[in-house]
Every structure is written in structure tokens, then in C-alpha cells.
Amino acid sequence: MNAEARTATDSGIPLVAVVSSYPLLAEAVEGALEGIAEVRAFPAGQGDTADFLRLLQPAAVVVDSPEEAEAAAEFAREARATLVHVSLREDRLRLLHAGRWQNLSDGSASPERIRSAVAAGIYLRGVRT
């Protein structure tokens, strides 16, 4: 099974997993990615994030805590998936790219910036809708 088949839903739309302690973050991401990806929300703090993501095989993951970012990074590196860490406290975005964290914004962790980071990662990876 190729990466595109594994990371897209049955409709061919890429799957994005949001692992968050805040349901409003998942709602904001879902609204921002409407028409681009299917978004599924999962509660943070379950302790098995990397294994869960391996089973789910999303094209991208959005998390909102350093602990979940670290756990999801293990999956993202293995699967070459896009990983965006949204720091709500610091109003900042980080993107895991080529195995390293890059700061995307300071002072603007808006849904639009999250959309841009996720969409760019998905399309650069070759998963198309």
C-alpha cells in the first residue's frame, strides 16, 4: 500500500488528526481545512499517541501540547507525515519538517496559518485530493 492510499480517506481526501485538550482547536482546524482534508479530533493525554497514529495513518497531525508533539513526532518521522504543534499559550506554531522543528509564527497561531502549514505539508508530500 502506498503512502497516498494509507493517508487518504475512502473519498481520497487526506486525513488530518487533531490531538488536543481543547475541542475548540479541533473545530477551528476543521473549519480552516474544509474542502482540503477530513479532520478527526481525538483527546490528548491518552498515553498512546504514537501507536494510535500508526494505526490511523493520517497525512497530517495537529497537536496542542509539548508532550503530544513529542509523541506525535515519533510517528511523523517514521511516516513522513506533517506535524504542526500549536502552542495556544504562546500563540505560536511549529512545524516538524525533515525531522527538525521550525518556528512558523510568533504571535499568530490563527486557523489560517494552521491551514497553510497543514496544506503545504500535505501537498509537498504528494498526497492530492
Residue spans of the language-model regions?
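Internal alpha/beta domain cores that form substrate/cofactor-binding pockets in large enzymes
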Residues: 2, 13-56, 60-128
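Extreme N-terminal leader/targeting regions
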Residues: 1-4, 8-9
